[in-house]
């Protein structure tokens, strides 16, 4: 959960946390508003798992490109967003809402354009945000109705190392 444009924006992990313990969400909201301090975890084993996960994801991305698929990577480094308010050459404050909206727009543009693969797809409606490692284009069989994008749709492909979530 994060505060964007003055409102809380939730992600799937927030929903999972709430289902596990409703009090956890209340603590997260309190930390977001500065009422309590959020605990910081420093666990080298989690860092190692994250590193291996990113390496695995990178290999999968390389495999998709090697197959000749058109891959559109959604940028999340803020380069697509130039927030207003820079003065005297100082950088403007990071605008998470603008970055999420830009990434979600890039995702929809890639899907409408018929990309074979959308890497790091982003979804954002102002209240919820989500990310998919990969969206894979699936062409429709003859006679199947078109989706909002055309005679194809997209399926989510996740590259988690775990077998179960």
Which role does the model predict for each range below?
Residues 149-165:
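A conserved hydrophobic secondary-structure block that centers on an alpha-helix together
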Residues 1-151:
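Metal-dependent nuclease catalytic cores that hydrolyze phosphodiester bonds in DNA/RNA
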């Amino acid at each position: 959960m994060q505060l964007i444009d003055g409102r809380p924006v939730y992600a799937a992990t927030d929903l999972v946390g709430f289902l596990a313990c409703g009090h956890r969400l209340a603590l997260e909201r309190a930390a977001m508003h500065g009422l309590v301090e959020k605990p910081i975890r420093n666990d080298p084993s989690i860092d190692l798992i994250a590193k291996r996960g990113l390496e695995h994801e990178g290999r999968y991305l390389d495999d998709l490109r090697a197959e000749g698929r058109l891959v559109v990577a959604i940028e999340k480094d803020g380069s697509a967003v130039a927030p207003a308010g820079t003065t005297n050459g100082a950088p403007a404050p990071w605008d998470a809402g603008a970055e999420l909206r830009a990434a979600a727009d890039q995702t929809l543009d890639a899907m409408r354009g018929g990309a074979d693969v959308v890497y790091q797809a982003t979804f954002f409606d102002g209240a919820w945000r989500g990310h998919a490692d990969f969206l894979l284009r699936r062409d429709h069989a003859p006679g199947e109705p078109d989706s909002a994008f055309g005679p194809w749709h997209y399926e989510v492909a996740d590259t988690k190392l775990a077998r179960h979530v």
